[in-house]
UniProtKB/Swiss-Prot annotation:
<keyword id="KW-1278">Translocase</keyword>
<dbReference type="GO" id="GO:0005739">
    <property type="term" value="C:mitochondrion"/>
</dbReference>
<dbReference type="GO" id="GO:0045259">
    <property type="term" value="C:proton-transporting ATP synthase complex"/>
</dbReference>
<dbReference type="InterPro" id="IPR000194">
    <property type="entry name" value="ATPase_F1/V1/A1_a/bsu_nucl-bd"/>
</dbReference>
<keyword id="KW-0375">Hydrogen ion transport</keyword>
<protein>
    <recommendedName>
        <fullName>ATP synthase subunit beta, chloroplastic</fullName>
        <ecNumber>7.1.2.2</ecNumber>
    </recommendedName>
</protein>
<keyword id="KW-0472">Membrane</keyword>
<dbReference type="InterPro" id="IPR050053">
    <property type="entry name" value="ATPase_alpha/beta_chains"/>
</dbReference>
<dbReference type="InterPro" id="IPR024034">
    <property type="entry name" value="ATPase_F1/V1_b/a_C"/>
</dbReference>
<keyword id="KW-0547">Nucleotide-binding</keyword>
<dbReference type="GO" id="GO:0016887">
    <property type="term" value="F:ATP hydrolysis activity"/>
</dbReference>
<keyword id="KW-0150">Chloroplast</keyword>
<dbReference type="Pfam" id="PF00006">
    <property type="entry name" value="ATP-synt_ab"/>
</dbReference>
<dbReference type="InterPro" id="IPR036121">
    <property type="entry name" value="ATPase_F1/V1/A1_a/bsu_N_sf"/>
</dbReference>
<dbReference type="InterPro" id="IPR020003">
    <property type="entry name" value="ATPase_a/bsu_AS"/>
</dbReference>
<keyword id="KW-0934">Plastid</keyword>
<comment type="similarity">
    <text>Belongs to the ATPase alpha/beta chains family.</text>
</comment>
Length: 499
């Protein structure tokens, strides 16, 4: 008898306890377990190790291989310290199942769906198995539509696809976390959606910092936890490879419930998708598989595909995924990032140079790309404006060496005009964020796509050539820039009168 897959893997019925196995071999996080003839568990079933004298060890494993001779090989989801040969193992009869639904918002979970934030148990009876098929082709929503973020540089130059996958590239300290939090905030306000954050194999300190910053910025509501906009799932660097390999699926399962049952638009963050591949490589070696190129697992593209194909738009709702991508040794041909790129619809590249200039979000307008930036999808007006913005910025980039050596005065009249407009565009691509209000003191701005296009058209047409470039820095729409220019002019006049 098998228990219902929507029952938590750790809750084992009395009947199920009869299907007991025993540990016969332990190699690090990998266990070999012998079961009675005819009682073999299925692949991906969760096994729970029983301690001596019925003490609970809280070690859950996942069946990966059926070895023959009534033995299975399983990978542990937590440390195997203290386990011994001969210990009893219970087959739960179902894959690892995790809590889903509104009660997960504002909480932090581990790979098994257990809360780790000391706020008590999760108030839900609804759970879902982490292993599921991707939606059938007939369920998919094939409409190509833009997912408006309210962030000017993203919406204009590298728009996100609803139900698409976006790669987020950036080093330390260039604003990845703030950009992630702003996206979480904006999807909640503009789309009535929720977010799920999957911390896969990254630093525990960063996970803690993110949680505290989310509380500070109101993304997680401390006074009323269910009013929060995000659920967090962590499987950090110190966890065994089994946990790091499966934590992405746990986060995705929670996101799928919001999409399929609540019919919401969901934002799924995975930080970092490379660590998912890395954990799979460790597990593969422990299971005795022959490695392929650069030591990666032979099943690399299958594992990546099984995760990525579940991230999609259906007729009920959408999951739009933003995945931080670490590129080992900056080698884009490495099998891990190369396999990831095959699934991405857009790339958002954060630039240290722009961050150093104080332009936030520090999204590089020339390096960031999107498959959605085509006239038949975004329309001629949007496409033309984006191309002209890129051409202006590219020309400015080409002229920077000449400016550095000879100065602005040596440029032609046309080039000087291009530089002036490019500098205004560069500053207008910055914008104040809601989640950064506590640091900047400036109220956050959500800028609609139509307003964004209108603003950049005004700069490119030369209408605003007379305004100072600082008027375009950290404003929302173009009307705010003209108002700021008037304020600057008035302040200048006042200071002149005082003199």
């Amino acid at each position: 008898m098998r228990i219902n897959p929507t029952t938590s893997g750790s809750e084992v019925s009395a009947v199920e306890k009869k299907n007991l196995g025993r540990i016969v071999k332990i190699i690090g996080p990998v266990l070999d377990v012998a079961f009675p003839p005819g009682k073999m568990p299925n692949i991906y079933n969760a096994l729970v190790v029983q301690g001596r004298d019925n003490e609970q060890t809280n070690v859950t494993c996942e069946v990966q291989q059926l070895l023959g001779n009534n033995r299975v090989r399983a990978v542990a989801m937590s440390d195997t310290d203290g386990l011994m040969r001969g210990m009893e193992v219970i087959d739960t009869g179902a894959p690892i199942s995790v809590p889903v639904g509104g009660s997960t918002l504002g909480r932090i979970f581990n790979v098994l769906g257990q809360p780790v934030d000391n706020l008590g148990p999760v108030d839900t009876n609804t759970t879902s198995p982490i292993h599921r098929s991707a939606p059938a082709f007939i369920q998919l929503d094939t409409k190509l539509s833009i997912f408006e973020t309210g962030i000017k540089v993203v919406d204009l130059l590298a728009p996100y696809r609803r139900g698409g996958k976006i790669g987020l590239f950036g080093g330390a300290g260039v604003g990845k976390t703030v950009l992630i939090m702003e996206l979480i905030n904006n999807i909640a306000k503009a789309h009535g959606g929720v977010s799920v954050f999957g911390g896969v194999g990254e630093r525990t300190r960063e996970g803690n910092d993110l949680y505290l910053e989310m509380k500070e910025s109101g993304v997680i509501n401390e006074e009323n936890i269910p009013e929060s906009k995000v659920a967090l799932v962590y499987g950090q660097m110190n966890e065994p490879p089994g946990a790091r390999m499966r934590v992405g699926l746990t986060a995705l399962t929670m996101a799928e419930y919001f999409r399929d049952v609540n019919e919401q638009d969901v934002l799924l963050f995975i930080d970092n998708i490379f660590r998912f591949v890395q954990a799979g490589s460790e597990v593969s070696a422990l299971l005795g598989r022959m490695p392929s190129a650069v030591g990666y697992q032979p099943t690399l593209s299958t594992e990546m595909g099984s995760l990525q194909e579940r991230i999609t738009s259906t007729k009920e709702g959408s999951i739009t995924s933003i995945q931080a991508v670490y590129v080992p040794a900056d080698d884009l041909t490495d099998p891990a990032p190369a396999t990831t790129f095959a699934h991405l619809d857009a790339t958002t590249v954060l630039s240290r140079g722009l961050a150093a200039k104080g332009i936030y979000p520090a999204v590089d307008p020339l390096d960031s790309t999107s498959t959605m930036l085509q006239p038949r999808i975004v329309g001629e007006e949007h496409y033309e404006t984006a191309q002209r913005v890129k051409q202006t910025l590219q020309r400015y980039k080409e002229l920077q060496d000449i400016i550095a050596i000879l100065g602005l005065d040596e440029l032609s009249e046309e080039d000087r005009l291009t530089v002036a407009r490019a500098r205004k565009i560069e500053r207008f691509l910055s914008q104040p964020f809601f989640v950064a209000e506590v640091f900047t003191g400036s109220p956050g701005k959500y800028v609609g796509l139509a307003e964004t296009i209108r603003g950049f058209q005004s700069i490119l047409s030369g209408e605003l050539d007379g305004l100072p470039e600082q008027a375009f820095y950290l404003v929302g729409n173009i009307d705010e820039a003209t108002a700021k220019a008037m304020n600057l002019k008035n302040l200048e006049m006042e200071s002149d009168l005082k003199k």
